[in-house]
Amino acid sequence: MLRKTPFLDGRNPPLLVHCGYHKVGTVWFARILGRVGSRYGLKVQRGMRVRGNKVTPPLPDTGIFIDPHSRAEGNTLPPFKGSHMVRDPRDMVISGYFYHKWTTERWVRMPGRMDGKDWGRSDWRGWTYHDILNSVDQEEGLAIEIHRASAGVLHRINSWDYDDPRFHEMQYRNVIADEDAAFATMFTHYGFTPKAVERSVEMAREFSFKNVTKRDVGEKSRGKSHLRSGQPGEWSQYFTGEHRKLFEEINPGLMVKLGYEISADW
């Protein structure tokens, strides 16, 4: 008889929670967890932003809760097992810069959305973020993206509690380096049986970068794509000395805290 539940303790299954960030594999993980949820009868819910930095809570029948912006507060959730993934914030800046130059996401095309920002210019009042980035050269555009990201997603990354044992911490660079091992560890943390871990890793493999894009990691898309190159460390090809200085000034110690650098002098 086929065992439906993936959990070692099938009578007391925890809520599964995955927290990520924009441009840090949120679509990738949603596809994987959606497939796993479908296989094992676990309802998947995507957390939606509500007032301020809050997120909609999981419903009573939710089995897998995906928070794409890491706004969920662990102490407000029912008993859970979670995963949380970060990416080199500098690569997030590069990925975000190129993506925001062409995406049709509503906020990027909303006139005046960037009004009042301390890094903005008075003649940009009423402009869309898309138009701002496309009106300046790459060097200035990356500086703008550093400012914007630092006030939002990078602030949340810096504020995250990395010592919460309920969350399995993951780094994009390590997942890309060995996807099978990374996902096996994640599903084991979730409390899956060895067989369920094996099956879930097989499902995750279907959504690997190469299988989805038909490109190797590091090979850039020829056109507009949500998945650009996937190569860790790409920031070093684009950051100038001024970009490095600006990033560290706004986000002091973040790269050392996350383990990407050993000192602030990078």
Features from the language model and the residues they span:
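The conserved 3'-phosphoadenosine-5'-phosphosulfate
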Residues: 42-60, 162-237, 241, 245
